[in-house]
């Protein structure tokens, strides 16, 4: 039932941005700030950001044939419809320069670190559509009941107890489809039920109040 997933862009969109730099000033400051060299740490999330902005610095070069003097990083925001902390408009209305101003505001970096940067925003209207509320009948099974030659693979098939928005979900859907249709005598890797872990539940409870 596609309408369960594509009927509300405001509830299912993020905005991302890609930044291209011609010098190492920003990466040098980030390494000093985080203690991690590019490509060795995870996301840097600004928890007090109205946009809930995150960035990640990849190991460089990130692209094939990327020039030695070029550095690239990526970021995104979960609430692009909200007014920024340092830019008085929603991210969805911002230019690349506005986004960089907001980013440097959170980092307390001088704008000179990115004054020659190219920042390209990208709106992703259905990026989290697979998380939209749904009925159990809104997603098909990877192999529908009684099907002999038809299967579905995607983030929009029904796999009980699994979590969407992961590579593993897509792989598991494909494995189920292939193994069932072709009678492959092999077990699909089991799903880790982290929601049943008392440690995970306790950590989530603590995090909710900190």
Question: What are these model-predicted stretches?
Answer:
Residues 1-194:
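C-terminal segments that line or cap access tunnels to active or ligand-binding sites in enzymes
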Residues 196-210:
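Acidic, Ser/Thr-rich low-complexity intrinsically disordered segments
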């Amino acid at each position: 039932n596609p309408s369960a997933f594509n009927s509300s862009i405001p509830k299912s969109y993020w905005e991302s941005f890609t930044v291209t730099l011609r010098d190492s000033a920003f990466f040098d400051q980030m390494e000093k700030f985080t203690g991690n060299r590019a490509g060795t740490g995870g996301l840097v999330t600004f928890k007090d950001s109205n946009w809930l902005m995150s960035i990640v610095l990849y190991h460089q070069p990130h692209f094939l044939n990327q020039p030695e003097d070029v550095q690239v990083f990526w970021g995104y925001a979960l609430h692009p419809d909200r007014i920024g902390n340092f830019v008085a408009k929603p991210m969805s209305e911002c230019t690349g320069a506005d986004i960089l101003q907001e980013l440097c505001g959170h980092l307390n970096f001088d704008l000179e670190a990115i004054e020659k940067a190219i920042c390209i925003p990208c709106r992703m209207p259905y990026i989290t559509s697979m998380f939209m509320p749904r009925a159990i009948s809104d997603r098909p099974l990877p192999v529908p009941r009684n099907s002999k030659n038809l299967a579905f693979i995607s983030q929009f098939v029904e796999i009980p107890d699994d979590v969407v928005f992961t590579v593993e979900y897509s792989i598991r859907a494909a494995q189920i489809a292939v193994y069932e249709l072709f009678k492959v005598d092999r077990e699909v890797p089991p799903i880790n039920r982290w929601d049943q872990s008392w440690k995970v539940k306790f950590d989530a409870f603590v995090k909710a109040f900190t």
